Amino acid sequence: MIRLENVSVDFPAGKDAQSRAVNNVNLTIQQGEVFGIVGTSGAGKSTLLRTINLLQRPTEGRVFLGDTLISDASGRELRQHRQRIGMIFQHFNLMHTRNVYDNVAFSLRAAGKSKEEIASRVPEILALVGLQDKEASYPAQLSGGQKQRVGIARAIANHPEVLLCDEPTSALDLETSASILALLKSINVRLGITIVLISHEMSVIKSICQRMAVMTGGNIVEEGEVFTIFSAPQHAYTKQLVSHTTPIELPERFKQNNKGVLLKILFADDSVEQPILSDVAQRFQVSVNILHGNIEYINDRALGHIIAQISYRDDPAAENLAAAITYIRQNTFGVEVIND
């Protein structure tokens, strides 16, 4: 378990001035989970991540790894704590004059492992990340995805309890990003390593994390299960991020020229599998026209967004229309009228 208590980080900002990058953060990350921190550039997420392994010392506050206070550690004690925490970076940070084998072996040598232990561990860990045939290759001969796999192998070579991931896919294309995220998820499941991942992309957080925090201006403004935050964001900034990830909007002309009521409907879990809109059409004698929609799965839970037009049939009856909307509201996760 990782626990941050009242952690703040200040940087010099001119003569006798300080700029606060992280402001009074309290955060608990459970053992074995994949936890995401999302925010735009300058939000403070990289600085916060680096306080966990003390690459960045907190100006204020305390950092715990398990029950151990590590933020006051230094020297040999700090090095011992850092061996419990691996880290991968946006731009890989490989040694270009050493081949793949030696890049991974470097972290083992630094930890004092014997030649025999290194000779046994390096092939094992390269096989885990799918690079068993690249031992003799140099970074210049590798693709971006392969370089990140070397970074992952190096980071987990010493059996860490925690893996910190600093924008691990931002330098990669979509297909390669997906393969790296799948690898991280597999490592989490197979090895039980706690993963803390930061990204400016909500889609990355959504694809791999169980819980998440939203960060802006050095502050965590929202925290919770990924599904809950995507289905019912509370903070205005979080709502903005979610809307960019799942854009469910119609051209303005549809709203202006539409003869019925336009509803933005949120389906979740079991309601996704129910014929709710079909039931509405039959029960209340209204016409239902689906204009836009999608369904996705977050941590094996269904989340759907639909924009539907509800209108009268041959015999207009306002009470039928109102009753239909009420029925939808009662049987889904949320309804918003968007053409009042």
From Swiss-Prot:
It comes from the Bacteria. The keyword ATP-binding applies. The keyword Phosphoprotein does not apply. Its EC number is 7.4.2.11. ATP binds at residues 39-46. It is found in: Cell inner membrane. Keywords: Amino-acid transport, ATP-binding, Cell inner membrane, Cell membrane, Membrane, Nucleotide-binding, Translocase, Transport. GO terms for cellular component: plasma membrane. GO terms for molecular function: ABC-type D-methionine transporter activity; ATP binding; ATP hydrolysis activity. SUPFAM superfamilies: ACT-like (SSF55021), P-loop containing nucleoside triphosphate hydrolases (SSF52540). It catalyses: L-methionine(out) + ATP + H2O = L-methionine(in) + ADP + phosphate + H(+); D-methionine(out) + ATP + H2O = D-methionine(in) + ADP + phosphate + H(+). Residues 2-242 form the ABC transporter domain. It is an enzyme of class 7 (translocase). Pfam families: ABC_tran, NIL. It is a peripheral membrane protein. Belongs to the ABC transporter superfamily. Methionine importer (TC 3.A.1.24) family. Part of the ABC transporter complex MetNIQ involved in methionine import. Responsible for energy coupling to the transport system. The complex is composed of two ATP-binding proteins (MetN), two transmembrane proteins (MetI) and a solute-binding protein (MetQ). This is Methionine import ATP-binding protein MetN 1.
